[in-house]
């Protein structure tokens, strides 16, 4: 299991390095230029971008010799799937750290650029939940479909994740009165819903992969 996870991390590393360089430059710009829109963009791009990096390389699961060789190793198919899900979580946390450092430096030099400090929580919740929903949708599609269509699957996953987040936010805004308590409840609801979807997706993907023949 550790070997599978290590391989997934290394497989993502080349894309993540390029994206990290972009995020560092973007972060410097965000610290120098005190603009709320820039900060929002950095949060969303940073957290979601690293998750996309893990999904892009998943195509190698079936198109390389390593992908087929893994099936001969003394590991279960559930372990193979679990390593993919854990890999996304790890890189999601990396993206969250990048964003946290940049926002911290921006607040240090310019103060909070949002109308309320609690708005930062909302941005984090939106980005994290979109990343989790994206993975929850992508992996079952990927393992049920064909590796050659992985690009189509992750585009579908991103669009669906955005739609789900917008739907949840719209419903909560209609049910809750404006206020800090409502903002916190909304952020927590997004995280809980996305985590639940991620967990259910894992079980579904294991079921799909265990029945698939190669």
What are these regions (language model features)?
Residues 1-65, 83-214:
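Hydrophobic alpha-helical transmembrane segments of membrane proteins
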Residues 79-81:
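Alpha-helix N-cap/helix-start motif at helix boundaries, enriched for small hydrophobics
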Residues 71-77:
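Short helix-to-coil transition segments within interhelical loops
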């Amino acid at each position: 299991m550790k070997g599978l996870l290590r391989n997934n991390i290394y497989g993502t590393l080349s894309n993540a390095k390029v994206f990290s360089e972009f995020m560092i430059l973007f972060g410097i710009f965000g610290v120098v230029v005190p603009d709320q829109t820039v900060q929002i963009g950095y949060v969303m791009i940073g957290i979601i971008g690293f998750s996309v990096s893990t999904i892009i390389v998943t195509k190698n699961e079936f198109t390389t010799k390593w992908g087929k060789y893994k099936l001969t190793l003394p590991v279960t198919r559930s372990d193979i799937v679990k390593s993919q899900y854990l890999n996304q979580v790890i890189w999601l946390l990396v993206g969250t750290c990048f964003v946290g450092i940049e926002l911290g430096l921006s607040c240090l030099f310019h103060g909070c650029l949002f109308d309320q400090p609690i708005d930062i929580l909302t941005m984090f919740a939106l980005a994290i939940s979109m990343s989790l929903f994206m993975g929850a949708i992508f992996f079952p599609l990927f393992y049920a479909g064909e590796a050659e269509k992985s690009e189509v699957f992750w585009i579908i996953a991103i669009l669906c994740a955005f739609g789900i987040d917008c739907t949840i936010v719209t419903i909560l805004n209609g049910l809750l009165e404006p206020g800090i308590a409502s903002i916190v409840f909304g952020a927590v609801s997004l995280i809980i819903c996305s985590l639940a979807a991620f967990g259910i997706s894992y079980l579904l993907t294991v079921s799909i992969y265990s029945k698939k023949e190669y």
